[in-house]
Amino acid sequence: MTLTQLNAFVLVARLGSVTAAASALGVSEPAVSQALSALRVHLGDQLVSRGPNGMTLTPGGSRLLATASQIVVLGAEAHAAVRAAQGAPDQLRVVASPTVAEFVTAPLLEAFTKRYATGLEASSGVAVTKEMAVLVANRLADVAIGPDVAADQGLPVVSEPIFKYRLVVVAGGQSHTRGPAHQWRWLVGPSATDPGSDVGHFVARLRVPEERMSVFPSQTAAWAAAADGGGVSVAVEHLVAQQLRRGELSLVDVPGSPGQGCWYATMLERQQRSAVASSLRRFLSTPEAMQLIRSPSAGVPPSKFRLPVYVTIWS
């Protein structure tokens, strides 16, 4: 029985699938399956099985989950302690929802790194809503920026609001929409495919069927397609302010628009939180951070966005 095997089991149990666990760890699905299989053989128990409603824990798996979670946390703390003893730089690992990752994370981390007193290794990546609390609780991320996820899975994390925003529907400046909203062509970014995100909730309330949605690899690409007259898109209002002023996009009135949203910082509870995570949380309350969130193009132009990949060490 190894730390790798226990880590794989905890993530499969928490996230509900081998696919989600592999994505969170940045490894292949066969690697997770092999680790889980080895643990099953060692313990003589199936631990978790696939049912009609997702993964189901066996009685043995249910008892193992709490203990395995503690061991995974202790392993992460041991790794951090050795790094500190070796004089290695502090690590900061941030995951974020797709829209935050596309526009906000890079300029925030760039500004925070410049302010940080000592050397800092900062990395960032994308996570869907159901992964965020699990990644933080299992020490695979220090901070997650996106929806409020603290109450979802009973994990020792807190979600604190950092920025309120408005969701609007936009189309090309000369576009004309006809008929009910659920019959329009919707051009959306990755957030719309996440049922736990504010954008996912917004689209679901309008009952937009899957066949009426075209999903683009970035929000910028979806807005560009809408500006070209291909359909309508959902946007965080302050992020498209320039396109609205230039007339490239225009607001479309739909029921429930504008919608209200909020980005939260999800972290471990205060007594368990790392010093660098606490420092980032304080920075997120500063006027400098608020300005970067309101006008992120001052940091990294959206046209240069490349979807980041979150990678963890599999050992």
Description of each model-found segment:
Residues 11-28:
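Short helix-boundary/capping micro-motifs
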Residues 28-31, 35-38, 108:
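Residues within the DNA-recognition helix of helix-turn-helix
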Residues 40-57:
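A short LG(V/I)-centered, amphipathic sequence patch enriched
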Residues 42-43, 64-86:
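Alpha-helical linker/hinge and terminal dimerization helices associated
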Residues 89-152, 315:
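Central regulatory/effector-binding core of bacterial HTH transcription factors
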Residues 127-132, 140, 147, 203-252, ...:
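Hydrophobic hinge/microswitch elements
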Residues 156-194, 201:
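Flexible hinge/capping segments at coil-to-helix
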Residues 182-209, 273-277, 290-298:
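Secondary-structure junction motif
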